[in-house]
Amino acid sequence: MRMDMLVRDINVFNSYFKRFIKGNAAIKDGKFYYIGERELDAFEPDRIVDGQGKYMVPGLIDIHLHIESTMVTPATFSYGLIKNGVTTIVPEPHEMANVFGISGVKEMIKASQDCVADMFYAIPSSVPATSMETTGGSIEIDDIDELMQTEDIICLGEIMNYYEVITDPDCKTNKILSHIRSRYPNLIIEGHVPKLLDLDLQKIINAGVNSDHTHQTVEGMDARIAAGMFIEIQEKSMTEEVIDYLKENQVDEHFCFVTDDVMTDSFQNRGHLNVLLKKAVQMGMTPEKAIYACTYTPAQRMRMHDRGAIAPGKTADFLLLSDLETFEIEQVYKKGELVYESARPYVQEMKEEQFPEHFYQSVKLAELTENDFNITIPESLESSKCRIINVQNGSTFTSETHDRIEGKEGQLSWEESPYGLIATFERYGKNGNRAHGLITGDVLKRGAVATTYSHDNHNLLVIGHNKQDMMIAANEVIRKQGGVCCVHDGKVLSMIPLPVGGILSEEPMDIVSKQVQHLTDALKSLGYEHYNVIMSLSTLSLPVSPALKITDHGLINVNEGKTVPLMMSDEA
């Protein structure tokens, strides 16, 4: 019997027993044909790979991530995935959808077609994430119907505005969920439900949302699994308590590991989903259980029954490892073809621009002046009690503090205060909205930074301690049609150009990685103390992440789902 390939003398991971079994693997037409002890006596392989006792595990599968968080194109992202053993992903392009609507989703899918890694897409469900921001595009019910006609769609992406879902039966997202339940009753619906417990948690499950990838605690996981919810565990949730819970309880079918957002420098220097797998093992989880949570359970969650296991009829995506402790990848195979080998050079083949011309002209803002960073108050007012965003290290959550800020000649004297200014400017040419706030905590203490990479609306966000630096940073980003720029004493310290929709670079991974690291170092030199400064910066405009954020509509009290004024009454 002729086979395309026989991999002999290997320890094969059996997903159904969650253990390794010594044997051989025959592959035909990109699929596993036989796993067992037979070899040359039964098969006539075109190629023979001597496994030399190595470990064969399925290609890793990441079912919750956003390519745009890495600031690179799908082709560059795929290049990074393969060398880290990730052969299948489910990206949710709500960042590009916020900029361009359905065309953003379609172009991301199109750009993924020739990638080595398989990409099955989630339809962005919450674009915009709330009604309290202006975006370049939106995803409506008609758009969902249109996208459902493509074979690349596998689920409805994370329902982010959970507060509206459980409090407002007539909100847009509830209409989308009702439409999905009626027209596509078998479609998987992904969730984003931080801190929900008890009745509120079960309300969101009743709405059809049955997974959560946000920060997990033991209490939260226990409640979710008990209610039938699937848990997608990011690295930030991998505490000792969480890993111990997963080790000690029979919940293997109810969780998997996901990356969600990976910055380019981390992707380049640390890795991807393989990082979480190795970390779980280092924290005491058995290699078999960790592999299972990165292969079989994510495949089952997304009903990708053709992969996630090494068994007859399954897609022949697999890795060869020399040991299970370090999880060092020696070879990666995609549909039975060798696509990466650690002993050989691995160079990305760059392509010409992949997106329509208007994707490179998305920042529709005139250059700013210092006056754009003024906060006007009544001339008779000598000071005002103000809300202040407090940035907390180690979290994208913020808190709200209050202080009295002096005023002079009808302007709030924020430059003389101990606080920075945070301002956002609508950049799609729709309404000219702008909003100002004050900021403190583990954020930059001098200079300025401006960015169009600002979740999820991706308007121009500027933070600084003086108007001149803020103006220079903002205008540099406007001139480059998007990016992140850091300025101090009138000089540009670092810049990441992001010309595709103001959020993506077409440079190769190693170049963008160096740019991200340089910008990170620059921001830290100005006092930004967060462990992931770019992620912290970009989520200050995310109105579904507690507690006080800012959009072009104003300051947002996330927990109450409403805008609140910067200046407060003395009685407040």
Listing of model-derived features with the role each one plays in the protein:
Residues 78-188, 492-497:
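Divalent-metal coordination cores built from histidine and acidic residues
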